[in-house]
Swiss-Prot record:
Alphabetical list of InterPro entries matching this protein: Ribosomal_uL16, Ribosomal_uL16_bact-type, Ribosomal_uL16_CS, Ribosomal_uL16_dom, Ribosomal_uL16_sf
A GO cellular-component term linked to this record: chloroplast
Keyword Nucleotide-binding: no
Name of this protein: Large ribosomal subunit protein uL16c
Organism expressing this protein natively: Chaetosphaeridium globosum
Lineage of source species: Eukaryota, Viridiplantae, Streptophyta, Coleochaetophyceae, Coleochaetales
Amino acid sequence: MLSPKRTKFRRHHRGRMKGISSRGNFIAFGKFALQALEPSWITSRQIEAGRRAMTRYARRGGKIWIRIFPDKPVTMRAAETRMGSGKGSPEFWVAVVKPGRILYEMSGVSESIAKSAMRIAAFKMPIKTQFLVKKDKV
């Protein structure tokens, strides 16, 4: 699963996801892509589940790029802990995703295989997504 090797600070504020994604919102590497349509936190486990589903379906053909990285730690307190005594310890990592962000890219396979693979990966995501095809420059 994905997580940063080291970070400047151990704990982050929760923040808020307002607006649309201004970065990572166009196809850069592959020919097909899965794009987010809703804002959400996507955990490293969900990213890995989507990647596994796509690689299993595409088999040897095709290359996959993961365009999001979980760099935000989410902290949790132990159950039945009293208030106070500081913030909880980091439990898992999430990627903050806004609408328009490209989650995965794929190339080297036919459109039908890519669409089916992305559809399986989309079921692993906690948000609505759409399938994109890169337009050829004339």
